[in-house]
Amino acid sequence: MTIKRKACIAGVYEHPTRHAPDKSLAQLHAEVAQGALADAGLSIADVDAYFCATDAPGLGPMSMIDYMGLKLRHYNSTEVGGASYTVHVAHAAEAIAAGKCSVALITLAGRPRAEGMATGTTPRVYNPAAPDVGFEAPFGPVTANMYALCAMRHMHEFGTASEQLAWVKVAASHHAQHNPHALLREVVTVEEVMASPMIADPLHRLDCCVITDGGGALVVVAPEVAKSLKRPKINLLGAGEASKNPSGGKVDLTYTGARWSGQRAFEEAGVKPGDIQYVSIYDSFTITVVMTLEDLGFCEKGRGGRFVADGNLISGVGKLPFNTDGGGLSNNHPGNRGSMTKVIEAVRQLRGEAHSKVQVKNCALALAHGTGGSIGTRHASATLVLERE
């Protein structure tokens, strides 16, 4: 079953806060839900499907369904880390195409900043019973050093330089300066990225994403519902999912699951990488962006460093503007899960609602990509191709 043009994104909302010590998780979920529904011109009573991941407090989606007073025909709580929300968009479209629902609400919320969570340097053990724990935990894997391993290997194989990775952060900062809600709005240089403290060689502090509270929400609807709303019609053209694993230790750190998820999304959409005018790329670290761009086909494998160092990611300058809200590197990474805001900014670009300084002229085709887990071990990749009708 194809989902091409079988569903539309009608509402988006990003919570303006980046620090929420005064709000509960449930409150944040409800606030972003209200915001996205208001953006779509719909109400809670219109929602007949709800999608969330384990950031939602309580028993799967059940507690938030009760808290928000939802009356549903369908729900889904797929959990694949930071890629969960790009996956949810695809799954919502599938449910709509199958006739299981017509208005799907997707929410994300988190409070890692308020809770003082040391996200990048805490042991990466999700569940002591997981089969991989005994093989990896003794070596002390944390988020930062697993991504650093990928960066180091990419440098060894392809000659990528730290200065090239820094250009990803430079591009993000150029965009974030125009976002009044961005956590970091100061434009930085390659030299400043290189001078920031080393976190896990070769990744510096400014190679790492921000830690923020807040959240976001999306409303995915059937085409007939979209036609009745006073919002630009944003169609889902294609979607792809993939996972990549160490395969019993035979891991290649130079590529990600985007190699497969991107191909599937492009095939369903019937477009090529060269057709895309704007990209939202998961940016947990600068190396994540470089490798993902390569694997999605926007540049040759091993040439991602050169591609970004040529300024290609800066809106108004390069050939492939990315993360024009500032992305996870400068703007927002709510709950340490970045794919929600990637979809939100892609929709803004397609609607022509991004800041005028970063808006892509006549943007009609965009891509949003999420990564969940760690590209250094097992991870999920999910790619969406979106179209303005």
Where are these regions (language model features)?
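Condensing-enzyme catalytic core mediating Claisen C-C bond formation in acyl metabolism
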Residues: 1-26, 133, 167, 198-260, ...
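Conserved active-site "lid/cap" helical segment
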Residues: 1-83, 91, 95, 150, ...
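Conserved catalytic cysteine-centered active-site region
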Residues: 3-5, 53-146, 184-210, 239-244, ...
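Beta-strand segments within the central parallel beta-sheet cores of soluble alpha/beta enzyme folds
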Residues: 44-53, 74-76, 104-109, 163-170, ...
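Short glycine/threonine-rich loop-to-helix capping motif typified by GTGT followed
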Residues: 56-67, 248-252, 283-306, 313, ...
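Active-site-proximal alpha-helical scaffold in enzymes
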Residues: 80-110, 144-178, 218-224, 333-354
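Molybdopterin (Moco) oxidoreductase catalytic core of the xanthine/aldehyde oxidoreductase family
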Residues: 133-139, 160-164, 180, 303-307
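Extended C-terminal subregions enriched in glycine
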Residues: 255, 259, 263-286, 295-298, ...
